[in-house]
Every structure is written in C-alpha cells, then in structure tokens.
C-alpha cells in the first residue's frame, strides 16, 4: 500500500452498502481472485494497478464485474492507505538485507557487463574526433551526424563492428550462466501466472519468426527499425504466404480453446464467457482471404448502378479516385433505359448464381463455420424478399433457437395474418420513385438519404400533367389490391384450412424438380408481373417447352442442390423442436396431405379439359354451318384423339407441373394461391361445359 496520505480522500467513492447480499466467503473470494490478477512485480501505486484491472475477469456467481468493483471500493474505503513508520522500517530492513534485488540487480559488482552494439562501438570510437572538428555542435547534433555516417559505411567496414559485438556477446552469455550458478538467490524469477497464454494473430506469429532472421542479418538494428522493416514486409507479403500464418493462428486458437476450457473447470470463480474464449484472432481482411481460398463466392454488387460502376472502374485505374464516381455517374445518365434494364437483369442473375454458389460452399463447411458465414450474410442486409435462400433460412433457424418459446403461438398467428393479406397498393409518388431511383443514386453517389430528399422535392414541384401517368398506375395498383382482397375473402374455407401453418424457423421447401426451379425463378424476378396469374403460368409452361435440354438439365441440377441443402436444414430444425412441437408439426402435415390429395387430384385432368375446350372453341369458330352434325361428330372424335396424344407426349412435363402446383403455397403469395383455386374452378366448369357440348352434339346427331 504505497499511496500518499491524501489517497484516503481521493479513494472514497459513493457506493451503496450491500453487506446483506455479500457474504464473508464471497468477499474473501473476491480478494483472492484480485490477488491472482495482480502483476508479478507490483511496484506501482495502488490506484494505477487498480485502474488496470480487468473487472470482468473478477465476475463470479451472480456478481458482475461492476458489482465486484463497487464492493472493492466499499472495502478499500474502510482500509487506511498510508504507511506507518513500523512498516517503513520493515521495508528498509528488507532493503538492507537484500540490496541487489529487482531492477538494481545489475549493480552487483560481479554482474557481467552487456556488450555494446555495433553502432555504439562506432559512435564511441568516432565521437571524440568529431567533437574536436565541430566544437560548436551539441551532443544531439553529433549523434545525428554519426548515425548518418554509420548508415553510409560500406558493409565490409560495418562487418568489423558486428563481429566484435558477436564475440563479446558470446562471452557475456557464458559469464551470465556462471553468475546464475554462483548467485541463484539473486536470479529468482517471479512466479508466472498459470493462466494460458492468449493465442497470437497471424502477423504476430510471422513477426516473431522473421525477427530472429532479421537480427541475424542486422544485429545492430533497434526495435523501431525492426518493426518498421518487418511491418513493410508484412504489408507486401503474398496472399499464399500470408495464408500459411493464418492457418497457424487458427490452429493455435483451437489449442487455446481446449486448454482454456480445462482451466475454467479448475477455476470456476473466474466466470470467463464463451465469447472471451472463442474470440477470433483474424482481422476482417484475413478472414475474407481465408474464405476466398476455401472457395467462398464473391458477393455481387447490390444493384445495377453499382455493377456498372464496378465494370467501368476496372478500366479507370489511371483516373484519380475522386473523379471516378463523377465519371461513372455521368456515363450512367447517358445510358438508355434499355441498357439500364439489361444491367438490372444481369445483376439479378448474378445474385441468383451467388446464392447457388454460396449453398455449395456452405455444404462443405463445419457447422460452426456455417453459422459464422450465415451471420455475416445477415449483417450485410440480405433482402427480405429473398428469405427463401439457404443463408437466410439457416439464419432464421438460429434466431428461432435463441428466442424464448413463450409467445410463439401469438407470433405465428400474427405472421399468418400478415401473409394472408395481398401486397399493399403504392401511391403515385412511390411508383415514380421506384422508376427513377437508379438515376438519383447515380447523381448523388449512392447517398440514398440525399436522393430521397431531392426526389420528394422534385415530386412536389412537378406539374399535374406530368403526374397523370403515375396517378393512373397508382389507381391500377389500388384496383389490383381491392380485386385480390375480394378474391381472398371469397376463397372457400376448406382451401384455407388445408394450408400449412408455418412453424417458427421452419426451412422453406426447395423446388422438387427443374420445372419448379425454372418457374420459381421467373415468378421471383418480376419479369411476368404485368400478366395475370393464369397467363403467367401459361407463359412459364411455353417457355419451358422452348428451352434446350441442356438448360433443363441445369435447372434440374440446381433443384437437386437445393433439395440436398433443404434436407440438411430440415433435419437440424426438427432436432431443435420440442417433442410437443414435433408431434403438432407431424399431425398438421398428415392432415395437409389428406386435404391436398382431395383438392389436387383432378388437376392433371383439368389441364386436358382446358386444352380440349380451347380446341372446341377453335372448331366452333371455323365451323359456321351448325346444321352439318355429322362433320361436328367427326371433328369431336379427332379432337379427342389429339387430346390423347398430347396427354401422352407431355405426361412427364405435366407431372412436373403437377408437383409445382403442390408447392404453390410455398412459392407464391396467398393471393396467387386463391387465383389458382379460381383457375381450378374455371377448369372444372370448362370441363362440364365441354362435356355438355359433346352431349348436345351427340343428341343432334
């Protein structure tokens, strides 16, 4: 206790008395733990050492670090912080008996003298000569001149000083070993803490290795010179060599985790958190480098403008960085809308490819690394509409495990209600903003806040005739919303009852085959949003027929990859469910299968009926003479045979499309599901009308 007498007043802090909460045993545990955290040579003022303590390491039981600090303040306020004469005499007695301890060890008459470094040898040799030549110079100026002269010395002359230093250094080491043998009482090392040494970063490991090599070549180098030289070397180190030290750092961290967990079992009072043990020793750049070599795909630009800028900047290395963005913005504005749309499509395609590549990358990673990658993907703000991607699936799954089970039923219900409602209609201003946001972002260098502010002002100052087009679009969107809402309300109850209620964290189903993946892609990118649902599905079918077998195989492979990942995620999710939730999930799925079978059984037939109806309509238009009943009968027979042939030839694709319909609930919004149900009803009515038409023909015949 080396503080001054005034330390008593300085050390006082207002802290609430909580003696009732702290038992004597707890207070003694706190003091004992504080002793273990004190430095080996505690020669500083108590206030200094106290300020350097890591109070979080003192936490134990239910006492946090701040509570431990508060309790220490209370206890220390009750203890005097000045020394009595008796204590000083005891210290003085110890000093007289053992005068050569601590930092004064080198004052022992027999302690070996350290050899001078090569530079100091040169300095001592030349100093007197230069002092006579330049008597007006100060010691500092002389030192600067001699330092410069030494650096300019030829290697041959410099080697003489280095060899002398190395010879004397060997003598010093021999004499030091002899001194240790003769004076073991003076060489007692302070007891080292048994806390495992923290793992080093890749740069620290590399520095320790290279430092030894550097000192062999530059024995006279100072610590600053070594740090500067090696720091420059590290910044220029090739990625492959840097990766070697990254792997070594990761291995060391794994070893540290194992040793530290054993240490925690022996010292439970330290209450070290799991985060403190598993904290990464890699920087963000080092982590990205390792991921890149492991095969992690590069994240694509977030939008078409960013993609355009990235492509343009690759050829603008000679242009100053301040001017690059200005040039990009100007050139983007000169592009036609068609060219901008092409970049938009290209950007969307890259995002899809990235998701597939990321899935493949995740499959080869251990679970711990998967969680890290998914957390990083979540942090950078993946779009909500892409929650069906594997990364967001698993991130949601992790979040579900962390959240409390209480109130889950209410959350599920609220989520279901939100999912049932169609997309809210947009205002005229919102539709206009969506169409011009790219240009404004380019103008303000991707500063969204500024762009939105200027867009609002532009809209307010816009003339009414310029707004008419957007007002009409908003009115159409409002009608769409009302139509979808009325369709949803008029949907029969059994169809809704058959729908699957989502469990929290449940992974979304992957496409079952190539056709489903193909249609999912077309529906999600918004390319067919201008078409009604029925025409949308017809267009998807016709496009599927037109693509080559190679492209179909590509979509089939994508679907298989997603299926494999889905099964892995689904198994993990099921294991995390409680017994009660698992039983409820299985029961619901059983009921869903039954209801789905009843509702969707005639789907393949209804397709044939729709086709036959369209053929009948064409026949009715061509056949203007309704009195010729025999010709009608012949045409009906031919139609039926054609229908049979077409059903045989497209049976495989129908089966794929049938599976697509089974998963429509997972792939589309509820309004689309309702419209599909309406399609089924229409197909049913069309089948009845066609059959009645056939019967009327036969009657007339």
From Swiss-Prot:
PROSITE patterns: HMG_BOX_2
Gene Ontology molecular function: any one: RNA polymerase I general transcription initiation factor activity
PANTHER family: UPSTREAM BINDING TRANSCRIPTION FACTOR (PTHR46318:SF3)
Segments of this protein annotated with the region Disordered: 1-21, 382-426, 584-701
Bias-annotated ranges (Polar residues): 597-612
Protein name: Nucleolar transcription factor 1-B
Amino acid composition bias (Basic and acidic residues), ranges on this chain: 408-426
Function: UBF recognizes the ribosomal RNA gene promotor and activates transcription mediated by RNA polymerase I through cooperative interactions with the species-specific factor SL1. It binds specifically to the upstream control element.
GO biological process: positive regulation of transcription by RNA polymerase I; transcription by RNA polymerase I
SUPFAM superfamilies: HMG-box
DNA-binding region(s), residue ranges: 112-180, 196-264, 298-362, 422-489, 508-574
Chain intervals with Low complexity compositional bias: 683-695
InterPro entries noted in UniProt: HMG_box_5, HMG_box_dom, HMG_box_dom_sf, UBF1
GO cellular component, one term: nucleolus
SMART domains xrefs: HMG
